[in-house]
Regions:
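N-terminal glycine-rich anion-binding loops that anchor highly charged ligand groups
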Residues: 6-14, 36-53
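N-terminal small/glycine-rich loop or linker at the start of catalytic domains
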Residues: 2-24, 78-79, 109, 139-143
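Active-site beta->alpha loop and helix N-cap motifs at the rims of alpha/beta catalytic domains
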Residues: 40, 46, 51-154
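N-terminal glycine-rich phosphate/pyrophosphate-binding loops that anchor nucleotide-derived ligands
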Residues: 2, 27, 55
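N-terminal phosphate-binding or glycine-rich loops at protein starts, especially the Walker A/P-loop
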Residues: 14-37, 42
């Protein structure tokens, strides 16, 4: 049985990032600020605020891109660590213009952690990008998807 009293387990609140699937990440700045204050009151320290998508044809709200310039306007409480999710396939897609999607060095960003949603088949191909982002000063999380049918050896 899993011992949930372990000190190294950290909660990552994904409410805004996950909720964005219902409204294209189009939350008002007022709503986001209120939400962040409530998260702080609840003593939650890690929040995945949104995605950092490549430019899309479809219009997305501010948390679909989670640009540094937008995050700075939110006055995020200092105790809260900000995470954004990226789709690994976006980095592996040769048709994307990566210049539109480069992360700043960590000390110029309010983002602390970048979580890569990665299919099992892509894990080896995404490693150079994980290293690149880590060199910029960010913490990196890999969300390994579609691995339930893999063997223990894989």
């Amino acid at each position: 049985m899993l011992n949930l009293k372990r000190k190294n387990i950290k909660l990552l609140d994904c409410t805004l990032r996950d909720g964005g699937y219902y409204n294209n990440w189009n939350f008002s700045k007022t709503f986001i600020k209120k939400y962040l204050l409530e998260i702080e009151k609840a003593n939650i320290r890690n929040i995945e605020i949104g995605f950092r998508f490549f430019k899309q044809k479809k219009k997305l709200g501010s948390l679909g891109y989670s640009k540094d310039s937008f995050l700075k306007k939110l006055n995020i409480p200092k105790k809260i660590n900000i995470c954004v999710m990226v789709n690994s396939e976006d980095f592996l897609n040769k048709t994307n213009n990566k210049k539109d999607h480069i992360f700043n060095i960590k000390n110029k960003s309010r983002i602390d952690t970048i979580r890569f949603a990665t299919h099992f088949r892509d894990i080896n191909n995404i490693i150079p990008y994980l290293k690149e982002v880590k060199k910029l000063g960010y913490k990196v999380i890999v969300n390994l998807m579609q691995c339930n049918d893999r063997s223990e050896n894989e």
